[in-house]
Amino acid sequence: MIYTDPATGATTNTDAAGNNYLNRLTPNTFLIILAVVVIVALIIIFMQSSSNGNNSSSPAAVPQMGFPLNTTMRANPFVATPQRL
């Protein structure tokens, strides 16, 4: 924006590169920021998924009600269970 001083009539360009930090945001800088955000998000997801210490290669001992799959399957009406004759 061009500002004109009413007293002196001098004009000042307020859109100079030093006044707006977005002018320094190049695509390369944006990609670096995006990569850092993605890496941090992946680290957080990894830490959350392995917070109880169990993974697919060495599953840890789980309490009895840790995964109530049996209860869930019994309560699911959409599972076709074989009937005894």
UniProtKB/Swiss-Prot annotation:
InterPro entries, per the entry: Baculo_ODV-E18
Compartments (UniProt record): Virion membrane
GO cellular component: membrane; viral envelope; virion membrane
Keywords noted in UniProt: Membrane, Viral envelope protein, Virion
Main location as per UniProt: virion
Superkingdom classification of source: Viruses
Role description: Component of the polyhedra envelope.
Protein name (record): Occlusion-derived virus envelope protein E18
Organism expressing this protein natively: Orgyia pseudotsugata multicapsid polyhedrosis virus
